[in-house]
Amino acid sequence: MKIAIDANVLVEWVTGDEFTIARLDALFAAPDIVLIIPTPALAEFLVGADEVGYQWLNSMEGKSRFQIAAFDRRAAMECALLEAKARRNGNKKGGSKAAWQKVKVDRQVLAIAKLHGAAFLMTADTQLSQFANGCGMETRVIDDLPLPESVKQRKLELEPPEDNS
């Protein structure tokens, strides 16, 4: 199954709490999963990435189930279709209240996800989620992923009781 992820998911994968990271690691470890990273989302991630972010990206790039998907000619055509539909419906921003530049980048991310056959787009961006849903693309958030057993079961490190005798 192919899953597209956006910039905020990438950021959470590197900087999130242990539960968030465990959920995403478990998703990626599943044998039938291919993660699609649209290049506009990757660029947004890299703007704020530090050395840890770059190291993480380098470690992921060599994996066959981690696909960086370009905004190429075919994606541009898909994106143009999305915008043309919005314009036909009377609002080039598709009803979004976001800045025009954000709407354009969101469309690029969505076009890439659709073009590469993503089953769903994982995002915490409400605007992108609404736009994707309106175009027939299912969206999910990280908390929709199951929590791995390895982080559910924790050992309590208790000190032995003091001997007060």
Sequence positions of predicted segments:
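Short basic/aromatic active-site micro-motif
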Residues: W100-Q108
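Acidic catalytic patch
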Residues: Q67-W100
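Short beta-strand scaffold positions
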Residues: I5, I37, A70, K104, ...
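General small-molecule cofactor/ligand-binding pocket signal
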Residues: I36, Q67-A69, R140-D143
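Short, hinge-like loop/turn segments at secondary-structure boundaries
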Residues: V52-W56, A86-R87, T139-V141
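Acidic, PIN/NYN-like endoribonuclease modules and their adjacent C-terminal/linker elements
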Residues: L110-S165
